[in-house]
Amino acid sequence: GIRDSSTSRGLGDVYKRQPLPGATILIVGTNNGTTTDFDGNFTIEASQGDVLVVSFVGYTTQEVPVEGDQLTISLALGNLLEEVIVTTGYGTQSKRDITGAVTTVEADELLSVPATTFSQQLQGRAAGVTITNDATPGGEATVRIRGFGTIGNNDPLYVIDGVPTTSPGNINPNDIESLQILKDASAASIYGARAANGVIVVTTKRGKVGSTQVSYNAYYGWQNVPNDLNTPAMNAAELGEYLYLADYYAGKTPSHGQYGFSGTPENPQISIPNYVFPSGANSVDESLYSLTPDNIYAITRSADTNWWQTLTAQAPITNHQIQASGANEKSQYAFTANYFSQDSPVVFVGYERATIRLNSSTKVLNDRLTLGENFSLSLDNRKGGYGNNSEQNAVSGSYKHHPLLPVYDISGPGGNPYGGFSGSRGLNLGNNFNPYASLSRNQDDRSKRFRALGNVFAEARIADKVTAKTSFGFDVVGRRYLDINRPQPEYVEGNFITVSY
């Protein structure tokens, strides 16, 4: 039969010599096999010299040669969990000794996804953790651990190399060795009320024992968006036909401030004007402008604009990293320098980040005292004024702006001091702003952030398995914004005069 002969490594003797029902026995090189019964016994037809492969969940698989008619096989409890070390708030523990809900994500899993932040890379890699991406370059993802716990702030606490912080921004994902996600209430015993929404413990890379390792890594790629939305937008003629039929089946005489309607519902005739005239303009000469005290609004030539394709383009993404690390029995060090750049598929928008990280530690006093530090400096720059948190953002404008309207008025690109953009100040054209004009005018906006994050620590070994550690951490963030509000005379609800910085 098969019995468990050893439960060493701290598990105790409670399972010693207990039968293992349901274990699998196979003859190597064949499909012949069987399983053990409730008492751990089995019968299998095998020849002398055959090798049996014996396996059981949680135990080390063993190969046993057939010698004689009777075999008693002992399996040792697998030590897989014992070899997994998890970083928690108090320090490190064997995974099998942890009673709380902890999920570990290794660096290889994170780096399989090229992303701006490690919170974006976490998506789909930890049960009970929900990630909602910002969808803008440099935007931080919204992380929720086991749902919402309050109507207020539900963000988890981040602990980066021992420094608690509320923001994972500016952290280079390539610097991360592993992540531990503490999901249950036990985290509050370490970090208090700050851990009410869970804790994400980030451990950065350290030097490995051996000779100095120097490496350079880079990648280049690009992001694309579909040429059309899932449901392609109507062109100018299709929209005109739709408006004609909408009026007709509503019991009204089809009419529109721009289109000309004739024909029948079965064969509607839609005429598109040569020019779109602003409300109040004389439709006499294409060079005429409508003048009011606070607005100058140009006549525009009718178009058939696909606004989605106008606002999007292929966007490159680039990453460069230099890394040097090394260690011996007494000390270790690791240094990285990284540059990351990402353009948005939405035109005139981008993000770039530069980071430097250094950590080192050394043992003194006959290895009874360890001294070390972790330092990170980063500077990131968000370019352009696109945001997706308002009704009037450019992407929503792409499907609300009328296809009759071109990007520019009859003066053309740069034809006047305000860009020469066309607008919707005309009958039945809505009040939406020109989304391309908005992105173009905001392309010089900047949001820069400098961050210094790190700590210094000392750890004393008092006795075997007893240590005391103290650390001093800091997280300093400085921000600088450039926000230019330029005139937008073509916008129905815009103000022609106001300019601010």
Spans of model-derived segments:
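Short, small-residue-biased leader/transition segments that mark boundaries at the very start
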Residues: G1-Y15
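Short, acidic, small-residue-rich periplasmic hinge/interaction motif at the N-terminus
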Residues: D13-K16, P21-G29, V51-T60, E67-L111, ...
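Short, acidic Ser/Thr/Gly-rich low-complexity loop/linker segments typical of extracellular
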Residues: N31-N41
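Extracytoplasmic beta-strand/coil segments of soluble accessory domains associated
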Residues: T43-E45, S119-D161, E177-S178, A188-K208
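A beta-strand signature from Gram-negative outer-membrane beta-barrel systems
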Residues: I73, R125-A127, P173-S215, T312, ...
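Surface-exposed loop/interface segments of Gram-negative outer-membrane beta-barrel transport/assembly proteins
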Residues: R96, K208-A303, S344-V349, T355-L453, ...
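Periplasmic plug
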Residues: D97, A141-A185, S211, N217, ...
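Outer-membrane beta-barrel transmembrane strands
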Residues: A313-S331, N338-F340, Y436-D483
